[in-house]
């Protein structure tokens, strides 16, 4: 009797184990058919305030509309460093500008039509890099040639052409990238026929306006959405010869990332056309001028926009 009971118990044990294994295999098969949830996505940025703000916006937007964990790797450096990090898979996305992508990355000549620039960049990034150029965020951030407000008033400066007579006595200050890129210093001075008093000072982007305010230089190349320009009483000169191409802000995302996590792309598309130049300028000033946390500034913006 005991022997039969032991045999029965042993048989039930093996049957139960086989059943559990079968159930486990079925559950694994079902899980494999479902879209992948969770995971980590890495957002990068260049080394200036607007980029850090936009990267934080991308991160919060993805976190709010997916189950993804978002890692922030901001302040990486210039355009080419971010581009290389994207291609190497060190980051999954970062904010870029269409004119920068066209000239500094693709090494193509500037164009003035925003739509043509966007579609050219989008097509080439897909073909060359397997990177998706998502729709513009809504604002253009072009280079701004900035002078002190008192100089602009005294010398009646409104356009870049207006400085030609004064440039030979002026010291200019630019970031390293502006000095090197195809749409930067060399083409700019040639287009406007400018000559300065010696070679330009190479300045860290965070020190440009301080150097101008302290009269270490007389002109700098900033960004048109910099909040400090007006706050410091400075003046951005009109690009009257339309030298600079459009620089529409766009998210750049690895195609492999979008294929793996389509919810990230859906979240980012909700940002299309949502930021005006004034809104971007105010966010930049909140960080630069009021020394507020970029994450807090972005949370307020997203709440105001119902994002």
PLM regions: where:
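A conserved helix-loop-strand patch within extracytoplasmic ligand-binding domains
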Residues: 114-172, 255, 273-277
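An extracytoplasmic/periplasmic, membrane-proximal ligand-sensing/linker region
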Residues: 179, 183-184, 189-191, 262-307
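Ligand-binding pocket segment of bilobal, Venus flytrap-like solute-binding proteins
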Residues: 168-239
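Ligand-binding "clamshell"
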Residues: 105-134, 214-217, 228-242
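Short, well-ordered beta-strand elements
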Residues: 38-50, 68-74, 168-173
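Short helix-initiation/N-cap motifs at beta->coil->alpha
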Residues: 69-84, 198-210
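Short, polar/charged alpha-helical segment
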Residues: 49-69, 87, 182, 186-190
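C-terminal motif of bacterial Sec signal peptides marking the signal peptidase cleavage site
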Residues: 29-32
């Amino acid at each position: 009797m005991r022997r039969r009971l032991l045999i029965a118990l042993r048989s039930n044990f093996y049957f139960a184990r086989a059943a559990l294994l079968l159930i486990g295999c079925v559950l694994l098969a079902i899980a494999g058919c479902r879209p992948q949830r969770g995971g980590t996505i890495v957002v990068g940025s260049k080394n200036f305030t607007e980029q850090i703000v936009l990267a934080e916006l991308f991160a919060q937007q993805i976190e709010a509309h997916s189950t993804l964990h978002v890692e922030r790797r901001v302040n990486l450096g210039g355009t080419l460093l971010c581009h290389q990090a994207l291609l190497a898979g060190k980051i999954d996305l970062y904010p870029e500008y269409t004119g920068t992508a066209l000239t500094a990355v693709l090494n193509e000549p500037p164009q003035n039509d925003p739509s043509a620039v966007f579609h050219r960049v989008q097509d080439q990034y897909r073909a060359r890099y397997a990177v998706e150029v998502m729709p513009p965020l809504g604002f253009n951030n072009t280079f701004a040639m900035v002078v002190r407000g008192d100089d602009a008033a005294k010398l009646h400066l409104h356009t870049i052409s207006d400085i030609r007579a004064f440039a030979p006595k002026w010291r200019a200050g630019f970031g390293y990238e502006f000095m090197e890129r195809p749409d930067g210093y060399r083409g700019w001075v040639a287009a406007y026929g400018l000559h300065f008093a010696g070679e330009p000072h190479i300045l860290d982007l965070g020190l440009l306006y301080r150097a101008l305010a302290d009269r270490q230089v007389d002109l700098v190349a900033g960004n048109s959405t910099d909040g400090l320009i007006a706050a410091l009483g400075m003046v951005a000169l009109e690009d009257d010869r339309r030298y600079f191409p459009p620089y529409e802000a766009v998210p750049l995302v690895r195609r492999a990332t979008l294929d793996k996590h389509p919810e990230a792309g859906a979240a980012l598309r909700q940002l299309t056309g949502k930021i005006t130049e004034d809104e971007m300028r105010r966010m930049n000033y909140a960080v630069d001028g009021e020394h507020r946390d970029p994450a807090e500034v972005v949370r307020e913006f997203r709440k105001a926009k119902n994002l």
